[in-house]
Amino acid sequence: MAKRLLPVGLVVGEITKTDTINYRTFKPETGGL
């Protein structure tokens, strides 16, 4: 199960290694959103 905690950047799925995660594409966004 994918975990979604808003605001974006906290926890998206199991990906927590990047600063900001695009919750729509589940891809790391450089520089944040």
Swiss-Prot record:
Domain of life of the source: Eukaryota
EC class (word): transferase
Location in the cell: Plastid, Chloroplast
Reaction catalyzed: RNA(n) + a ribonucleoside 5'-triphosphate = RNA(n+1) + diphosphate
Keyword ATP-binding assigned: no
Keyword list, A-Z: Chloroplast, DNA-directed RNA polymerase, Nucleotidyltransferase, Plastid, Transcription, Transferase
Keyword field contains Mitochondrion: no
Annotated EC: 2.7.7.6
Cellular component annotations (GO), alphabetically ordered: chloroplast; DNA-directed RNA polymerase complex; mitochondrion
UniProt GO MF annotations: DNA-directed RNA polymerase activity
Function description: DNA-dependent RNA polymerase catalyzes the transcription of DNA into RNA using the four ribonucleoside triphosphates as substrates.
Assembly and binders: In plastids the minimal PEP RNA polymerase catalytic core is composed of four subunits: alpha, beta, beta', and beta''. When a (nuclear-encoded) sigma factor is associated with the core the holoenzyme is formed, which can initiate transcription.
Family, per entry: Belongs to the RNA polymerase beta' chain family. RpoC1 subfamily.
Protein name listed in UniProt: DNA-directed RNA polymerase subunit beta'
Organism: Heterosigma akashiwo
Gene behind this protein: rpoC1
